[in-house]
A protein has these predicted regions:
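C-terminal and inter-domain tail/linker signature
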Residues: 1-257
Length: 257
């Protein structure tokens, strides 16, 4: 809508004691963190639309379940910005927001066609958009990684190798305020797997991916990135019920020998 609408975003963890079963996940009786990100559209002083994302596999792993076979990067409870300045309750310099949005757009456009053989090697391409000490706070199933070289090794390279065709479906919200910005789509991408992703076999048919990206800019480049991917929905399109497989809920009993 030409950046005419107003959106407010919140991201972090909901903390509590996991004392009751949830989605078939057995309680632990211990503290647990539910990673979330929400986008709220504001009209006439009231919320008119909300998009709410939860990293449910992240909670499952804290509860002792292993919903995925392997992770290429680190599993941890993800902190807020290194600069501890992510809470913005006052007006920000519009010029800083414009710089952040420009950095995000440059990165997205620079990687738009990852099959182009004439492009730079991956690490060199990433250096055009990212600071060397970048941190990529990825979702459960992939994990978090630090520095451009490790990001290329532990996520960006394997991700690009896992898919062939990529269709960009657009964003429902894309914004920047100060040194922070982000976007989400429903879905953002349609991808065709090449045969394996996250250590699991895939079928070569187009599937949708719902993604949230939140960024922090430092200087002229991006330096932190928090990612949410709806992997329960993603794998369900491949015929895999991650919740049922990890918890046993809804799974048919195996026939007797």
């Amino acid at each position: 809508d030409g950046f005419e609408s107003v959106w407010v975003t919140s991201m972090g963890h909901l903390m509590g004691l996991f004392d009751n079963e949830w989605l078939g996940i057995a309680p632990t009786g211990k503290m647990i963190f539910l990673r979330y990100c929400e986008f709220n559209k504001i009209e006439h002083g009231k919320i008119t639309e909300t998009a709410m994302f939860f990293d449910i596999p992240h909670l499952m792993m804290q509860a002792g379940l292993q919903p995925f076979l392997t992770q290429t990067a680190a599993h941890l409870v993800q902190p807020g910005p290194v600069t501890h300045d992510g809470l913005m309750f006052g007006e920000q310099d519009p010029k800083e927001g414009e710089k952040t949005l420009a950095a995000i757009d440059f990165m997205v456009n620079d990687m738009r066609d990852w099959k182009d053989a004439k492009k730079l090697p991956l690490v060199e391409e990433l250096r055009r958009s990212w600071n060397e000490d970048m941190i990529w706070w990825g979702p459960a199933g992939i994990g978090a990684t630090y520095t451009i070289e490790r990001y290329a090794e532990q996520h960006s390279g394997p991700f690009r190798a896992a898919f062939t065709d990529r269709i960009f479906n657009g964003h429902l919200c894309r914004f920047a305020e100060g040194k922070f910005g982000g976007f989400f789509g429903w879905p953002n991408l349609t991808l065709t797997p090449t045969g394996e992703f996250m250590g699991m076999p895939t079928k070569a048919k187009p599937i949708d991916m719902r993604v949230i990206d939140m960024y922090r800019r430092e200087g002229s480049k991006l330096t932190e990135n928090w990612i949410f991917i709806d992997f329960l929905y993603f794998w369900n399109q491949q015929g895999v019920d991650i919740l049922a497989r990890a918890t046993g809920i809804g799974m048919e009993d195996e026939p007797p020998n």
